[in-house]
From Swiss-Prot:
UniProt cross-references to HAMAP family, sorted A to Z: ATP_synth_alpha_bact
GO cellular component, one term: proton-transporting ATP synthase complex
NCBIfam families: atpA, PRK13343.1
GO MF annotations in UniProt: ADP binding; ATP binding; proton-transporting ATP synthase activity, rotational mechanism
EC top class, as a word: translocase
InterPro entries: ATP_synth_asu-like_sf, ATP_synth_asu_C, ATP_synth_asu_C_sf, ATP_synth_F1_a_nt-bd_dom, ATP_synth_F1_asu, ATPase_a/bsu_AS, ATPase_F1/V1/A1_a/bsu_N, ATPase_F1/V1/A1_a/bsu_N_sf
Topology class, membrane: Peripheral membrane protein
Site feature location: Required for activity: 372
Main location: membrane
Protein name, UniProt field: ATP synthase subunit alpha
Similarity comment text for this entry: Belongs to the ATPase alpha/beta chains family.
Length: 512
């Protein structure tokens, strides 16, 4: 059976026509050594710093050390399946994560992959994890309040939208509780805002190096309260490799910036940055970078400053969005002068200092009002709050000073005794159970009662009961006053003070 020449040429022509001209070219290298989450790779000559590379089996890594003869790559995942001689491919893209509203209500890892078992997340946009912070021109000074619902914080250490307020304290002093209450407190504001995006606040919580059980507990609380609907949880738990714990805060910030850059508002909680610094130290030492103070690398300040500078209040031309940050730092034995705490204190716009001693005395949240400050928040405080909260900080400072002296002398004059009595009641008034944030108007009423002598005749042990009963009275009989404070935001002096005094007096006369 002979094959016709024409047939042969037709087959050849057909094959030539269908031949793909596009040859896939990928720059590949080979693994020289691997261990402790670090791979040394030879042959990736044109790789960029911070570029994503791919190992066999889809494991991803990031090129961090570009040396003359090899590249130091940190591995996002288990290094058990990577061996010497494996090929490593460039992806030609800097480490990016998915961003968008589709992430709300979900729990993701440091690369944006879902880990809550609710199926894949289909986002329309991705963003580079470690982008440059906004410059000076697009920014605006902080002027809108970011209410936490905690009396001690909102009255004395106010936080504004676009601020970075550090929460610092030893282990088990309630640092996460303060941040979680701030997230839960947004529910009433977001519900009241309806479709008005300029009033809503979206929340991103980043767990760095925490126990999985702790993160699961927190997610459960967010789900129970319905706060998960406006929140994203990014988890790089203690069992994740160090590169994931290092990357998670940057990824989460990229997710939060989606809201900031679209004229909306977001709050991000980093829990906690001490563990991120530790994982970065581990990576740096394994990459053979020279150690500095406390064996941290020389650029550990830049690690945190470039992260926290991305939280900002943008001006009118940039859409008026904001990103507020609550970084958490854990101290050892109350030592605020250690390397990482001093670094982050100098980067942030104030700190909430929590003390073990106060916590064990039952003063919770255990805020040390003397050492805690808010450097820019006072301009963001509501008029009503700033007009009633002024005397509180002064009274408590005088009380602390006098209480120290009062231990020595028994015969105190009447004015000192009165100052001590009021200080004790105000301290009691600042206590607040977890998961029970109050609205701005409610805090104004409570503090007004405390500073205007309504508590002077109440026993210290009954202050909590007085506060609860007062709030119930205001909600049931004087909800118009609460609404007036919320909507009008009046300065509480003159007629406004008389109006509030009348409402509280009516209750105080019957309280027993």
């Amino acid at each position: 059976m002979g094959i016709q020449a024409a047939e042969i040429s037709a087959i050849l022509k057909d094959q030539i026509k269908n031949f793909g001209q596009e040859a896939e070219v990928a720059e590949v290298g080979r693994v020289l050594s691997v261990g402790d989450g670090i791979a040394r790779v030879y042959g990736l000559d044109n790789v960029q710093a911070g570029e994503m590379v791919e190992f066999p089996g889809g494991i991803q890594g990031m090129a961090l050390n570009l040396e003359s003869d090899n590249v130091g790559v940190v591995i996002f995942g288990s290094d058990r399946d990577i061996k010497e001689g494996d090929t490593v491919k460039r992806t030609n893209s800097i480490v990016s994560v998915p961003t968008g509203d589709e992430l709300l209500g979900r729990v993701v890892d440091g690369l944006g992959n879902p880990i809550d078992g609710k199926g894949p997340i289909k986002t329309k946009t991705t963003s580079v994890a470690d982008v440059k912070a906004p410059g000076i021109i697009p920014r605006k000074s902080v002027h809108e309040p970011m209410a936490t619902g905690l009396k001690a914080v909102d009255s004395m250490i106010p936080i504004g939208r676009g601020q970075r307020e550090l929460i610092i304290g030893d282990r088990q002093t309630g640092k996460t509780a303060v941040a979680l209450d701030a997230i839960l407190n947004q529910k009433s504001y977001n519900d009241a805002a309806g479709d008005d995006e300029s009033k809503k606040l979206y929340c991103v919580y980043v767990a760095i190096g925490q126990k999985r059980s702790t993160v699961a507990q927190l997610v459960k609380k967010l789900e129970e309260t319905g706060a998960i609907n406006y929140s994203i949880v990014v988890a790089a738990t203690a069992s994740e490799p160090a590169p994931m714990q290092f990357l998670a805060p940057y990824s989460a910030t990229a997710m939060a910036e989606h809201f900031r850059d679209n004229g909306r508002h977001a709050l991000i909680v980093y829990d906690d940055l001490s563990k991120q610094a530790v994982s970065y130290r581990q990576m740096s030492l394994l990459l053979r970078r020279p150690p500095g103070r406390e064996a941290y690398p020389g650029d550990v300040f830049y690690l945190h400053s470039r992260l926290l500078e991305r939280s900002a209040k943008l001006g009118d031309d940039a859409g008026n969005g904001s990103l507020t940050a609550l970084p958490i730092i854990e101290t050892q034995g109350g030592d605020v002068s250690a390397f990482i705490p001093t670094n982050v204190i100098s980067i942030t716009d104030g700190q909430i200092f929590l003390e073990t001693e106060l916590f064990y005395q039952g003063i919770r949240p255990a805020v040390n009002t003397g050492l805690s400050v808010s450097r820019v928040g006072s301009s963001a405080q509501t008029s009503a709050m700033s007009s009633v909260a002024g005397p509180v900080k002064l009274s408590l400072a005088q009380y602390r000073e006098m209480a120290a002296f009062a231990q020595f002398g028994s015969d105190l004059d009447a004015s000192t005794q009165q100052l001590l009595a009021r200080g004790a009641r105000l301290t009691e008034l600042m206590k607040q159970p977890q998961y029970s944030p109050l609205t701005n108007a409610e805090i104004v009423c409570v503090i007004f009662a405390g500073t205007n002598g309504f508590l002077d005749k109440v026993d210290v042990k009954d202050v909590g009961r007085f506060e609860e009963a007062l709030l119930n009275h205001m909600r049931s009989k004087h909800s118009d006053v609460l609404d007036w404070i919320t909507n009008e935001d009046p300065k509480i002096k003159g007629d406004a003070a008389d109006k509030l005094k009348a409402a509280i007096s009516e209750f105080a006369s019957d309280f027993a």
